[in-house]
Every structure is written in C-alpha cells, then in structure tokens.
Amino acid sequence: MSTRMHFSQQTLSLLFDAILVDDIVDQHIELPAYLPTNFSSEQLAECLNLCQQLWLEGVANTQLRCLIKKIIIHKNLNSEERLSYKYIRAKYKHMGFAFILYTASHKRPLLFEATSTLMGEAQDAFRNQVTSKTLSTGLLLNAITAWPFSQFTQQYVQNAKLDPQSFMQHFKNDGKRIPEFLASHSVTPAQFHALRKIISRHVSFFDTLRTLYPNEMYYKMSRFLSAINGMMGSMHDELVQKSLLKKIDYHKDKISIPNE
C-alpha cells in the first residue's frame, strides 16, 4: 500500500459536513464563470486519500452489521438508527464515487458496489414499508458484510490508487454525457438515475476539493451541482416509490426530464 497523507479530524468533519448538504438546494445559486478542469496530481492524490480516510476511520462494520440485523428482525429502523444508517451509507457512496473518479478502472470493486447498492435498496424498501424487499436486501447485506468479505472490502479501499491522466479523461467524458442525456426527449427512471449519478460524483469531487483547497470557485461548483442533485433526488425518490409499488417499470417506462 502506498504512503498516504493523514488528515486531521477537523478536515474529516469539514468534508462530512459538505457531504451532508450535497443534495440541498440553496436559495441563491450562482454558477462559476467557467468550469474548473486544471487540477494537479497532488490535489487529486490528496482528494483520494481523504476519501479513503473518511471511509476507513468513519465506517465501523460492527455498527453496520448491528443495523442490518435490526433491519432483518424488525423490517425497519427507528429514527436514530436511520440517521446512523444514512451516515454510513453516505460514506460508502462518497468512497464509491472516489473509485469511479480517481482509479484507472473507473469502477467500484464488485463487493464494494454490491454492498453500497444493497444499502440503498434496503433504505428505499424500509422507507416505503415494503417488508419483503426489506428482508431480502437485509439478508444479502448480512451475508456480504460478514468476515472475510468485510476484510476484502477494507483492502479494496486501502489499495485504491490514483491515475491522474485517466481521471482527467473520465472527468471530461462525464461532462459530455450530461448534455447528451438532456437532449433526450424522454428517459427511463434507470437512465435518469444514471444521469444523477454523474452529477452526484462531480458534487463529491468538488466537496472534497473545496475541503482541502478552500476556493470560491470550487465552492460555487459544489453548491450549484448540489442544487441539481437535490432536485433530481426528490424526483428519483418518487420514481423509486412508484417502482416499489409496481406503478411503473423502472427499466422500461419513459419519463420526461424537467426543463427547470
């Protein structure tokens, strides 16, 4: 494992505070004059290191498994448990975006992806009181977060490595995909979610960057993208609810992308 910088608890807290508002729509949103694209290898390496440290020090597998067992038994979580679950999932999502952004494969490792995805599906299920789905996702989560799988997941995070050249190409390609989506007359909910994931990972990048390098332009990019992310998130929550209630086919039915 390569040597990494170690950041203070204050820096970790600043990043997590930014993550917690990455879907909040500010009253006054201003897009920067231009999209920043000139990032040094040192900046990118520090961003990845911070994401790794946030996950490694901020996600306790024992706590996650305790919550999973409650999901299995009660098919739900109380308000305090939901908040703990939300915080763990937020750190999983942020590290997941880091795998996609910074590493050469631009993919989450399969086991990490499965855990993060199932956490989201379980949350959607218990929020919407779909007990059968809550139980099935809970059982799967219980299996893949047990030892030795939990050890593999930790090693994936520890061993994630930056590819600076690949980052820039992927970052630019993401930027090209957004107008392609928006030019479509209609998309499936799954395609809409794919577009939101692009926005979300760019939010995560600028959240991390502005934590390490406080800068008005980075802050504006983070908050502008967060506003879009938040509006899309509210719409996606409704689509997920309709899908769970069998009112729409998540992968086949078409929806219109809002103009505003």
Short names for language-model regions:
Residues 1-260:
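Function-determining surface determinants
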